[in-house]
From Swiss-Prot:
Disruption phenotype: Cells synthesize a flagellar basal body, lacking the distal P and L rings. It is found in: Periplasm; Bacterial flagellum basal body. GO terms for cellular component: bacterial-type flagellum basal body; periplasmic space. It comes from Caulobacter vibrioides (strain ATCC 19089 / CIP 103742 / CB 15). This is Distal basal body ring component protein. GO terms for biological process: bacterial-type flagellum assembly. Keywords: Bacterial flagellum, Periplasm, Signal.
Amino acid sequence: MKAFLFAAAATLVITALSAPAFAGTPVTLRMDTTDADGRITLGDLFDGVSGPAANVVVAARMSATAVLEAGQVQMSARRAGYVWTNANGVRRIIVREGVDNGGVSSSAAPGAQLAGARLAGAPRANVEVLAYARSLSAGEIVQPQDLIWVKMAGAPADAPRDADAVIGLAAKRPLREGAPVGMKDVAAAQVIKSGDLITITYEDGGISLSLQGKAMAAAAAGDVFAVQNTLSKKIIQAVAVGPGAAAVGPQAQSLQARSQPLRFAAR
């Protein structure tokens, strides 16, 4: 009888030792978290999730982006048998409209599919990234309240280190809430539109002259643009000074030189 009990106990110990650990399978957060159908799944969020668990829905995306609490995502992964340690202390995960499971659409070129596969397997490192707190229309000026710092898996190559670098600049195209900020997204705000009637001034050594012209292109302060003299119809190059105003001559050269750092940073 004692021998039987000893054998049974040994069997239980061996079974317990051979059972998979409760911690589950480790996974890593994807560098670019996107989904295509509004159903955010574990497969959309993590590398290393496979089988039915990849289709477990964590949340729904009702707009262009969705913001998920990292703790809730972590619990969802654990319930499915996966562990995300979140060693970098991510607080929120931003999921944007894109493709499912971090891949590419079936219509994408083979080269794009290969690039997507390489990206999915790249090393991950979460960092603080400046993102848009709301969606902006093209031409809209970026205000301090339009920016927030969030944790993301990676930052754009042209990500600004300081919010002051983009505050006061204009969106070059529609920008989505939650998207990371890149300097290529913005440019100096346009002060002159194509077709505007403007005043062109020339100042040098106490001499001041002015004439009326028609802007042949849009321009931001400090930009060189073409202007047509409304009397002679000749085209000249001037530097935008402000709304409805441009300059030529030494004054224009000085204004252009001062604006160079700003325009370089906005590219």
